[in-house]
Regions:
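Non-heme di-metal
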Residues: 2-163
Length: 163
C-alpha cells in the first residue's frame, strides 16, 4: 500500500511571516520569495535534459525575477525594507528549501505550482489596495505571470503523468 506524501502547506508556512510585516514590507517579502523561487526554477532547469523544458523553466525564473523587480520598484525604500525583512527572517532562504527537500522533483513542482497560485492571489490583493493605476496594472501583470508559472508546472506534471 503506497501512501501519498503530505505536501507542505505554503500558506501555513508563510502567513505568519506576512503577519509580522507592514504592507510595504509584505511587498518586499513577496519580492524576496519570488527571487528564491527563481533560484529553484534555475536549479530545476539544470537537472532537465529536454531543451524545451529547460528553456521553459528558465523563462519561469525570469518571470519570478521580473515580479520581484516590479514589487521592489513600487516603493522608494525597497533596499532598506529588504534588509529589514532579511534581518527579521534570517532563515527565509532555508525555510522553503527545507520544506520541499524531502520531496521528489515532481512533488516539489506541485508544491511550487500551489505557491504560484498563492503568489498570484497575493499580488491581486496588493493590486486591489494600490491607489496608483500604473502600479495596479503592473501588479496584475505580475499576478498573471505567477499564474503562467503555475500553468507551466501543471502542464509539465500532466505530461509526466504525475498530477
Amino acid at each position: 500500500m503506497s501512501t501519498k506524501p503530505v505536501l507542505p502547506d505554503l500558506l501555513a508556512l508563510f502567513t505568519p511571516l506576512f503577519d509580522q510585516c507592514t504592507p510595504d514590507e509584505q511587498r518586499i517579502l513577496l519580492a524576496v520569495l519570488e527571487r528564491l523561487a527563481a533560484e529553484h526554477y534555475r536549479r530545476w532547469a539544470e537537472g532537465l535534459s529536454d531543451p524545451a523544458q529547460k528553456r521553459d523553466f528558465l523563462a519561469a525564473a525570469a518571470r519570478e525575477e521580473h515580479i520581484a523587480a516590479v514589487l521592489e520598484g513600487l516603493g522608494p525604500r525597497a533596499e532598506h525594507l529588504a534588509r529589514t525583512v532579511w534581518q527579521r527572517f534570517p532563515h527565509l532562504r532555508t525555510l522553503y528549501a527545507d520544506a520541499i527537500q524531502p520531496l521528489s522533483r515532481e512533488e516539489q513542482w506541485k508544491v511550487q505550482s500551489i505557491g504560484e497560485h498563492g503568489g498570484a492571489e497575493l499580488l491581486r490583493s496588493f493590486a486591489a489596495a494600490e491607489v496608483n493605476p500604473d502600479g495596479r496594472a503592473k501588479l496584475l501583470v505580475c499576478a498573471a505571470e505567477d499564474e503562467e508559472n503555475a500553468q507551466l508546472l501543471a502542464e509539465v506534471l500532466k505530461t509526466m503523468g504525475a498530477q
